[in-house]
Amino acid sequence: MANLNKRPDWIKVKAPNSTEYYNTKDLIKNLRLNTVCEEAACPNIGECWSKKHTTVMILGSVCTRACRFCNVKTGRPDLLDPYEPQRLAEAVQKLNLKHVVITSVDRDDLEDGGASHFAECISEIRKSSPNTTIEILTPDFLRKEGAAEIIANAKPDVFNHNVETVPSLYKTIRPGARYYNSLSLLHNIKKLSPEIFTKSGMMVGLGEEINEVVQVIDDLREAKVDFLTIGQYLQPTKNHAEVAKYVTPEEFKYLERVAKTKGFLMVSANPLTRSSYHADEDFQKLKENYQQKLVS
């Protein structure tokens, strides 16, 4: 039996040490912003921050959910910061970002789940950096009536919501969420604003069967999702769900081939794929693929 405590060579990444990495880190700290890169212990942080790519996490640093895969703190959430949208817009301007990714903790305590705060952040960035494209990675807004409409009206360039895993693992891995609610949210955003690119992702290596992954791929395409990401689950701490398997690069290539036959505009499937990894480059490819589809 393989030693799952030792990561295979294809998972290993270099420790961050570039000047650009530390400059990005200092700016984020000075503007009192949270990032999912740090909170979720992302393995790609060194590469991304060295390129001044970061995923800002709004609505505080404490989540109202306790998903078994996630390293973000859970508990009593922070008070909503009304000045966060302006500070975020300032960071985007100072980093001269062409593409920004905004995510958040779950805020089940808020009436709209934080949807209006996302909208304010989008609005502030549009004011100071009108040429910057905006991608948002949101919670599921479970039982938050009107949240999808708020998001759709804010017109992000990309709307991302991750289904995270296969339905059979929701009770143990993502107990506060509902798989079909996530599918419905993705479908509703596309129906409300067809021009918004939709995106979703999942982790593998949690104990799912390959046929379950293929079914999720089918479900996401049925929900009109444009861009699919699939990456390897990595255990953040010993208190989180254990890795059941390290999926090989060859297996990821197989999943990518399967997904590409379903009609997605883009598919990214490899061990280090994360929702916002190479998001700026992928957005350009997404637009190009859409234009090619129109003329084909």
Swiss-Prot record:
State where it is primarily located.
cytoplasm
Provide the disulphide bond pattern: none
Gene3D superfamilies hit by this protein: Aldolase class I
The record's subcellular location field reads:
Cytoplasm
Family annotation (PROSITE patterns): RADICAL_SAM
Query: Could you tell me the keywords of this UniProt record?
Result: 4Fe-4S, Cytoplasm, Iron, Iron-sulfur, Metal-binding, S-adenosyl-L-methionine, Transferase
**UniProt similarity note:** Belongs to the radical SAM superfamily. Lipoyl synthase family.
Name this polypeptide is given: Lipoyl synthase
The organism is Rickettsia peacockii (strain Rustic)
Instruction: Give me the gene this protein comes from.
Output: lipA
